[in-house]
Structure formats: structure tokens, C-alpha cells
Amino acid sequence: MREIVHLQTGQCGNQIGTKFWEIISDEHGIQPTGEYTGADKDLMELQLERINVYYNEGNQGKYVPRAVLVDLEPGTMDSVRAGPHGQLFKPDSFVFGQSGAGNNWAKGHYTEGAELVDSVLDVVRKEAEKCDCLQGFQLTHSLGGGTGSGMGTLLVSKIREEFPDRIMNTFSVVPSPKVSDTVVEPYNATLSIHQLVENTDETYCIDNEALYDICFRTLKLQNPTYGDLNHLVSLTMSGVTTCFRFPGQLNADLRKLAVNMVPFPRLHFFMPGFAPLTARGSQQYRALTVPELTQQMFDAKNMMAACDPRHGRYLTVAAIFRGRMSMKEVDEQMYNIQNKNSSFFVEWIPNNVKTAVCDIPPRGIKMASTFIGNSTAIHELFKRVGEQFTAMFRRKAFLHWYTGEGMDEMEFTEAESNMNDLVSEYQQYQEATADDEAEFEEEGEVEGEYA
């Protein structure tokens, strides 16, 4: 089977990662003890057919997540272990330090994290060796802190060195000004993005601001907690990985998804979305129709990144529908969306919307859909972080925390310009048209005549 090794680093990464395991264990009929208790025979086949993508089968028929949990302080690990699904993970999967990274990217990447990284790689190597045919890695982390961002990107580059031909996929929580934990988030995020541009194949940008907006506006929650935000993230992660976990034809592994979604290697930052949005613990009373799902899924309010897709154009889109529904209706709806909103899709990539359907819906809903868009509007997110970075870096504010760990100012300048380049690349393709090439050729000919 095509296995995926899952890594989670830092407090945020461990919390959304653990929530992800809770949800997919539930979908595959796996108890917190690791035992399989399926319902009927038909469902059992579906649940277990591709269970090996995320789980190892241990002794006594127990299923163990192929996960590596990493942090530079023991706190989050202890709460995962004490939580309802703590017994699911095997003890060797927990790798932690004692000192913490103190929201400092340099500590995570160069000092504290670098000391721990070899023991993490040992666990990763052991997991990879047990695989029949490893397809790649997925990492959950945040870009605003120290461990997830600094050590997360260090792990990514080390794994890239050791497994250069495997796909690297990250779920990255991007900081936002409205929901800020630390003042140095723009530094940590910019230094991380500098790494992610070069070393990952697919990055899902999840944005706290967008998640808060969804909680306020759509779910009508008065004071949302991180638990509510993580619930939204895990719904999306479960949806995005549906194609890998259940039998299906489209985007059935990380590489196929990358081939469909990434037109240029640097532009691999995706905007995820989900429909229907429901609050934790609430059940939906009315089943949505396929047109409603499609409508909601493309709506800016349902995006998990705080960018407005109407301000850019889609390079590529993947949609995953879940539940029992007519394939014909799904295709018609997706076709309609492209026709009615053709100006929002670049015309120089024909057929740039791919759709997959999986029979098994998420728990408690009849039908759901997940959206993955590679939109040029994501440059708004990078621009926002870049502006905050520049404001502080111009005054060299807080820089001594980083140079004290042995970093050089030059590295900040490089990260800043790499992010600015990324923004202008997205803008360039947003304005590109299918006729650009032809225009250049004509100009060349005209010059030739006068020569």
C-alpha cells in the first residue's frame, strides 16, 4: 500500500494533528484503544481497504497511527497522552525536549531544535523502513511560534535531503494580525515561508483569522476557543485526505494531487475550504443539495485562508464530494461554476477543475464537500505577513533574540525578498492571458522587419 508518514510539531501542530487522528479514527471505525469495531460488512471493506495509508497494523490486530509527535517542551505531549486518544499512539512516537523554543524561530531551527532533530529523524526512518511503498510525508504545524515553524521547517529540509523523491505535504497555520499570540509572528512566518517555498510540494494555508470569521459569522459562536478552530481544521484535513484513505479514482495519492494542482513548482500554496460548516457538537437538520454544497464551497466565507478568491484567479482547483450523490449532478454543477465564473479561472490552463466523489460522508452529515484551490489571491496573505515583517525589520525590532542564537541579518533579508518574489510571481500569473505568448512573437517579428 501507499503509506504516508504523519508528523506534528509544536503546540499547534500537535493539537490539530491529534484532532485529525480522532476524526479519521472515527471514520475508519478505530477505537481509542486501536481496535477496529466496524458496523456492517460493506462498510468494513471500505474502511479497511486503504487503512494502511495512515495506520500500521500492530499485534493483536490493533491499528497504530503512523505518526511522529514532536515538541521542544513536554506540556502538549502530556495532554495528548492524557487525552481520550492518548493510548492510540505508540510510546516511541513521542519525541520531546525540555527547554521549549520560546516562540523563537532561531531556537527551533538552529539551536534547541537542531539538538532534537536527529532523534526525530530516527523515528521517521524507522516508520519509513516499515512501509511497503512510502508515498510521502505530511506535517501539521503553525508558522507563528518557535517549534512548529523553526523546527518544523528544519525537519522538512532534513527529510527532503534523505527522501528527495517523496512528496512533502504540510498543513500550515498562518498567523494573522487579529488573532496574534506573539509579537514576533511575522518574523517566524516569513522565515518559515522562505523554507516552505523551496522544500515542500504542497502546503495548505490555514489562517486563524479566517477560522475566527467562520466561527463568528457562520457558526454564530460568541467566543470561539482554539477547540472550535481546531474542529474546523480537522474537518478540512479529513476532507482533503479522503481520496488517499478511501478507494476512489481521482487524486488517489499525494503525487497525483500535486501533478493536478501545482502548475509551477514555487506556487504550491493552497486555500482549503469546506461545506457545510457546522459547529462542534451540533447536528445538521437539513441535508444540503449538491448545488448548495457547490455554491457554499466556492464561497469566500467558507475559505480557511483569509484571502478573497474574487481578488485573484484560480490556477487549479480540486473538489472532493462525500456522501451518496449523483455523479452526473456533481459534474453539471462543477461545469456550471466554471462557465458562469470563467473570469475567475485562468484560461491558459484548460480543464483546471478536478472533482472526486467518495461514498462515505463525515460523521453526522449526509453530504459534504471539501475544496482545494490554488488561487493567485493567496498573495494577499503573504503580502500581509510581509508588510508586518518589514515594519519591524526596518527598525531591527526584536532582532537580538534571533542574532543571539547565531542567526545573521542577511538571512532575514533573503527571506523577505523570497517572499516578495513569491507575491510578484502570483501577481504575474494572475494578469497573464492565453494570448500573451502570441503578442511577444508578433513584437519580435515587427522588430525583425525594421532591422
UniProtKB/Swiss-Prot annotation:
Compositional bias ranges of the Acidic residues kind: 433-451
Source species, domain of life: Eukaryota
Keywords, comma-separated and alphabetical: Cytoplasm, Cytoskeleton, GTP-binding, Magnesium, Metal-binding, Microtubule, Nucleotide-binding
GO cellular component terms attached to this protein's record: cytoplasm; microtubule
Protein name as it appears in the record: Tubulin beta-1 chain
Residues annotated for Mg(2+) binding in this entry: 73
Protein's UniProt keywords contain Cytoplasm: yes
Binding site for GTP: 11, 73, 142, 146-148, 208, 230
Gene Ontology biological process terms, A to Z: microtubule-based process
Known function: Tubulin is the major constituent of microtubules, a cylinder consisting of laterally associated linear protofilaments composed of alpha- and beta-tubulin heterodimers. Microtubules grow by the addition of GTP-tubulin dimers to the microtubule end, where a stabilizing cap forms. Below the cap, tubulin dimers are in GDP-bound state, owing to GTPase activity of alpha-tubulin.
Region annotated Disordered, chain positions: 430-451
GO molecular function, one term: structural constituent of cytoskeleton
Localization annotation: Cytoplasm, Cytoskeleton
Keyword rRNA processing: no
